[in-house]
């Protein structure tokens, strides 16, 4: 497995594989890899001859400097895991390599609508940072396929729109959420949880599934349902951040034409911001 830190060397390897007629898959990550990331690598391996994994903690998508500073950097361990999983190349650039002129003068990519709604409304600039780094990676790697986790539901929708709007010839694959046995979605940020908080964390998943059951039973009093869930989260020790039930295809409020809903949840538990989502078929 190759470990590369510069775009020049990355392009050289990509060019060689292209000349050999290889199909290339990209798995963008911010490192601190867990089993959820490994399922992305497995999916990429099933769809391509070459698997490239990027490991880059992207400063442009952090709105809080303290959050950026404490995000875990575990490159050596990440590379060991990726080597065992069969990745072909790890691209691990520094911020100075990706943004040589600094963030203030960096050209950016913005996806109208999706960048500023829902999570984007409370995290200004976050999705601009996501769209910009993903675009840079797409330009550097020029993959045939790219794999992203469905845990970041709005991010996945944004990347799909980016690909459509910019004309990238890339298949975007959403990979289902990987969960612990108690339902908690695997996340690099779960490491921020204390032992006591880790015991409480699955409550987020449990309340999400309770909302799913209400939708299955025909309840459409969305605001009331979300208010009750927020109160239950507070009683359990969480600080609710974002709770939405939206059309799974458009991320707009549900209407009579909606056939699928998505429950989007984010809440703070101690120093960890936990996110999760679940899709519900409304036609049953």
Swiss-Prot record:
It is found in: Cytoplasm. GO terms for molecular function: ATP binding; pantoate-beta-alanine ligase activity. GO terms for biological process: pantothenate biosynthetic process. The keyword Transferase does not apply. InterPro entries: Cyt_trans-like, Pantoate_ligase, Pantoate_ligase_C, Rossmann-like_a/b/a_fold. (R)-pantoate binds at residues 61, 155. One of its GO terms (cellular component) is cytosol. It catalyses: (R)-pantoate + beta-alanine + ATP = (R)-pantothenate + AMP + diphosphate + H(+). Pfam families: Pantoate_ligase. Pathway: Cofactor biosynthesis; (R)-pantothenate biosynthesis; (R)-pantothenate from (R)-pantoate and beta-alanine: step 1/1. Transmembrane segments: none annotated. Its main location: cytoplasm. Beta-alanine binds at residue 61. Keywords: ATP-binding, Cytoplasm, Ligase, Nucleotide-binding, Pantothenate biosynthesis. The active site is at residue 37. Its EC number is 6.3.2.1. The reaction proceeds by a bi uni uni bi ping pong mechanism. Catalyzes the condensation of pantoate with beta-alanine in an ATP-dependent reaction via a pantoyl-adenylate intermediate. HAMAP family: PanC (MF_00158). Belongs to the pantothenate synthetase family. Homodimer. This is Pantothenate synthetase. It comes from Pectobacterium carotovorum subsp. carotovorum (strain PC1).
């Amino acid at each position: 497995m190759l470990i590369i830190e510069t775009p020049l060397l990355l392009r050289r390897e990509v060019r060689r594989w292209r000349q050999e007629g290889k199909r290339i898959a990209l798995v963008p990550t911010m490192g601190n890899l867990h089993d959820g990331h490994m399922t992305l690598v497995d999916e990429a391996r099933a769809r391509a001859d070459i698997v490239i994994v990027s490991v880059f903690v992207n400063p442009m998508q952090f709105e809080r400097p303290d959050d950026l500073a404490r995000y875990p950097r575990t490159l050596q361990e990440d590379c060991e895991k990726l080597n065992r999983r069969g990745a072909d190349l790890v691209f691990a650039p520094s911020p100075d390599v990706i943004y040589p002129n600094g963030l203030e003068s960096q050209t950016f990519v913005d996806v109208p609508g999706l960048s500023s709604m829902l999570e984007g409304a409370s995290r200004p600039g976050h999705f601009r940072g996501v769209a910009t780094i993903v675009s840079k990676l797409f330009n550097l790697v020029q993959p045939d396929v790219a794999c992203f986790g469905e845990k970041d539901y709005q991010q996945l929708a944004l990347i799909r729109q980016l690909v459509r709007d910019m004309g990238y010839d890339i298949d975007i694959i959403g990979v289902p959420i990987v969960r612990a046995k108690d339902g908690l979605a695997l996340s690099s940020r779960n490491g921020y949880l204390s032992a006591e908080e880790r015991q409480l964390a699955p409550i987020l998943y449990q309340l999400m599934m309770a909302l799913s059951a209400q939708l299955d039973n025909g309840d459409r009093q969305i605001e009331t349902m979300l208010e009750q869930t927020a109160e239950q989260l507070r009683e359990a020790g969480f600080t609710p951040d974002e709770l939405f039930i939206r059309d799974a295809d458009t991320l707009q409020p549900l209407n009579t034409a909606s056939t699928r809903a998505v429950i989007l949840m984010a809440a703070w538990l101690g120093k960890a911001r936990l996110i999760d989502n679940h899709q519900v078929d409304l036609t049953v």
